[in-house]
Curated annotation (Swiss-Prot):
Domain of life of the organism encoding this protein: Eukaryota
Subcellular location per the Swiss-Prot or TrEMBL entry: Plastid, Chloroplast thylakoid membrane
Keyword check for Translocase: yes
Organism: Ipomoea purpurea
Gene coding for it: ndhD
Record's bilayer topology term: Multi-pass membrane protein
Entry's family note: Belongs to the complex I subunit 4 family.
Keyword Mitochondrion: no
Enzyme class: translocase
Gene Ontology MF: a single term: ubiquinone binding
Protein name: NAD(P)H-quinone oxidoreductase chain 4, chloroplastic
This protein's GO CC annotations: chloroplast thylakoid membrane
TM regions (residue ranges): 3-23, 37-57, 84-104, 113-130, 134-154, 167-187, 208-228, 242-262, 274-294, 305-325, 330-350, 385-405, 416-436, 462-482
Length: 503
């Protein structure tokens, strides 16, 4: 048995190493950029080594467990552990954060603080995915608020303060429900309050109280996911944030809410989840259609991509509500798939804006000839977004689709109706994606404009785009590479779920 604190090192290393950035030389930003990038690469290598040599894929139990006393009065411990649900999001966090650091090269104002905030987010995100203590989960959840708020309010567009304030109000409001739920779970049914996640999993709750807990946690996670109607902060945030920040938001932050729904709502409250799962499927289906139609009407490029993210999150919600192993595995695969695709689209949108200084689609057109590399990459990730066969999104959406069809909980006509509406959402995706490509790259508006000389993608942008495209294609061609991480854990969740239902 390995007692080396691998997870603690993985969690605390980025933020502690990032604090050194304030003591680096003042001359230029080159040293700061390279130092931060090296920290991210080293962290990713340590994480990959730990999971390759100290994690058993076929073991659904919690592995690499670490427990250290923290606050004795509340029995609050530093509890860390990983399983099949955690590994994928943690590796995704390391990969996207490393590339977002590379994408942040144009940031020159207050670069020390900028890169430190990115590393602080890195620690918070990994800490959340690895935490096995409810209070630690809440702390890591809240650790995201301040870095994201500062990244939004200090680096972004003209309305960045408005979008940052809207973000903090929504997420802080959701955090109140999360805190109330954590305290309620801790104080119920125990002589001594404990935040131990395992204790809460094995605890039975009265039906009414379980529903109240479920709703409280659901509101907190629905804000972060986001789920209708708590999604309105997302387009404003993406529309104003720097594209490296957008990569972290779309690639990782949104996935924290979906992870919380599976980790807490499904595992801790099976009876309530059984009651609310039909509503999750309905909301997810409506979200797909609504966000797709709204995306089609957006003039702002980044807002169009933001609404496409909301639409794709609908698949995750439907997969969680399907209560089948196929659907839940599809939802987990969609979390990873959209993490790559969403981050890449926002990066390419940002690099395009750096060159043409335009963000409205009706002002663009005709740049495909002048920027063929960016056109090729943008087209590739747009195809991945609309679930082209051979790309990761195709497998994820197909699994969710089959999951809802094979669900025994729902009536036959209900499944037919849901599948039909999902098919409409799938059809709407290429409409807004291909329309975006047509408005940006085709035509002659900018091609014939005076002084319309634009630089194409450089080595840095090309390397970053290809680095994301390769896993998207790899997962699309061999999805078992990701599914093998979660399939055993999903079976345990559902078997435990139905066992608790019988009791």
């Amino acid at each position: 048995m390995n007692f080396f604190p691998w997870l603690t090192i993985i969690v605390v290393f980025p933020i502690f190493a990032g604090s050194i950035v304030f003591f680096l030389p003042h001359k230029g930003n080159r040293v700061i950029r390279w130092y931060t990038l090296c920290i991210c690469i080293l962290e990713l290598l340590i994480t990959t080594y730990t999971f390759c040599f100290h994690f058993q894929v076929d073991d659904p139990l919690i592995q690499l467990e670490e427990t250290y006393k923290w606050i004795n009065f509340f029995d609050c411990h530093w509890r860390l552990g990983i399983d099949g649900l955690s590994v994928g999001p943690i590796l995704l966090t390391g990969f996207i954060t490393t590339l977002a650091t590379l994408a942040a090269r144009p940031v020159t104002r207050d670069s020390r603080l900028f890169h430190f905030l990115m590393l602080a987010m890195y620690s918070g995100q990994i800490g959340l995915f690895a935490s096995r203590d409810l209070f630690l989960f809440f702390i890591m959840w809240e650790l995201e608020l301040i870095p994201v708020y500062l990244l939004l309010s200090m680096w972004g567009g003209k309305k960045r303060l408005y979008s940052a304030t809207k973000f903090i109000l929504y997420t802080a409001g959701g955090s109140i429900f999360l805190l109330m739920g954590v305290l309620g779970l801790t104080l119920y049914g125990s002589n001594e309050p404990t935040f131990n996640f395992e204790t809460s999993v094995n605890q039975s709750y009265p039906a009414a109280l379980e529903i109240i807990f479920y709703i409280g946690f659901f509101i907190a996670f629905a804000v972060k996911s986001p789920i209708l109607p708590l999604h309105t902060w997302l387009p404003d945030t993406h529309g104003e944030a720097h594209y490296s920040t957008c990569m972290l938001l779309a690639g990782i932050l949104l996935k924290m809410g979906a992870y919380g729904l599976i980790r807490i709502n499904m595992e801790l409250f099976p009876h309530a989840h059984s009651l609310f799962s039909p509503y999750l499927v309905i909301v997810g289906t409506i979200q797909m259609i609504y966000a797709a139609l709204t995306s089609l009407g957006q003039r702002n490029l980044k807002r169009r991509i933001a609404y496409s993210s909301v639409s794709h999150m609908g698949f995750i919600i439907i997969g969680i509500g399907s209560m089948t192993d196929t659907g839940l595995n599809g939802a987990l695969l969609q979390i990873i798939s959209h993490g790559f695709i969403g981050a890449a689209l926002f990066f390419l949108a940002g690099t395009t804006y750096d060159r043409i200084r335009l963000v409205y689609l009706d002002e663009m057109g005709g740049i495909a000839i002048q920027m063929p590399k960016i056109f090729t990459m943008f087209s590739s990730f747009s195809m991945a977004s609309l679930a082209l066969p051979g790309m990761s999104g195709f497998v994820a959406e197909l699994l969710v689709f089959f999951g809802i069809i094979s669900a025994k909980k729902y009536l036959f006509m209900s499944k037919i109706l849901i599948s039909f509406v999902m098919a409409i959402g799938i059809i709407l995706t290429p409409i807004y994606s291909l329309s975006m490509l047509r408005q940006m790259f085709y035509g002659y508006k900018l091609f014939n404009a005076p002084n319309s000389s634009f630089l194409d993608s450089g080595p840095r942008e090309l390397f970053l785009s290809i680095s994301i495209l390769l896993p998207v294609i790899g997962i699309g061609m061999y999805p078992d590479f990701v599914l093998s991480l979660s399939v055993e854990k999903v079976e345990v969740i559902l078997s435990h779920f139905f066992y608790r239902q019988v009791l």
